[in-house]
A protein has these predicted regions:
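Acetyl-CoA-dependent GNAT
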Residues: 4-72, 77, 95-96
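Short hydrophobic/aromatic beta-strand or adjacent loop that forms the aromatic wall/cage
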Residues: 42-43, 134-138
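Conserved GNAT acetyl-CoA-binding A-motif
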Residues: 95, 102-114
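Conserved acetyl-CoA-binding loop of GNAT-fold acetyltransferases
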Residues: 126-135
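Conserved acetyl-CoA-binding loop-helix of GNAT-fold acetyltransferases
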Residues: 81, 87-100, 123, 127
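Conserved beta-strand-loop-alpha-helix junction that forms the acyl-donor binding cleft
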Residues: 111-121, 140-143
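Hydrophobic adenine-recognition pocket in adenosine-nucleotide-binding enzymes
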Residues: 5, 79-81, 114, 130
């Protein structure tokens, strides 16, 4: 079942991020970010909960993508589903929920970046209707 992410999801989010994406971020920092981003209309956070156990099995996090060279859309920052439940339609459901929100807001697209080595993710995105339109490198400056 799709629903908004909640404060009680922090442990599950941390576990999913570690197991699926390889990111370690403390529960305290995750809770702080979740509280802040949940109140920001430029961020959209949607979870998928098991209807029987009420355990969070996956989530999508998107931000508004606006520029001087395109109409507004969503940029997916994270789509993560617990490894034990992948292949059951959870990721597809989360993206359908994101599609609905993008259309409700009048956005023209949803975009995402996916690491070069994540071939399984690439196949999934293509299966659910996304196309690869660019190959690029990411540059970052850390303070």
């Amino acid at each position: 079942m799709l629903r908004d992410l909640q404060e009680t999801d922090v442990k599950a989010i941390c576990d999913i991020n570690q197991e699926t994406l390889g990111y370690t971020f403390s529960p305290e920092d995750t809770a702080s970010q979740l509280a802040r981003l949940s109140q920001d209309s430029h961020h959209f956070l949607l979870g998928y909960e098991d209807v029987t156990s009420h355990v969070l099995l996956g989530y999508v996090h998107a931000e508004v993508y606006e520029s001087l060279y395109s109409k507004a859309g969503f940029n997916i920052l994270a789509l993560a589903v617990s490894p034990q439940t992948q292949g059951q339609g959870i990721g597809k459901s989360l993206l359908q929920g994101l599609d609905q929100e993008a259309k409700r807001r009048g956005y023209g697209f949803i975009r995402l970046n996916s690491a070069d080595h994540r071939l399984g993710a690439h196949a999934f995105y293509e299966k659910v209707g996304y196309t690869c339109d660019k190959v690029q490198k990411r540059f970052i400056r850390i303070f």
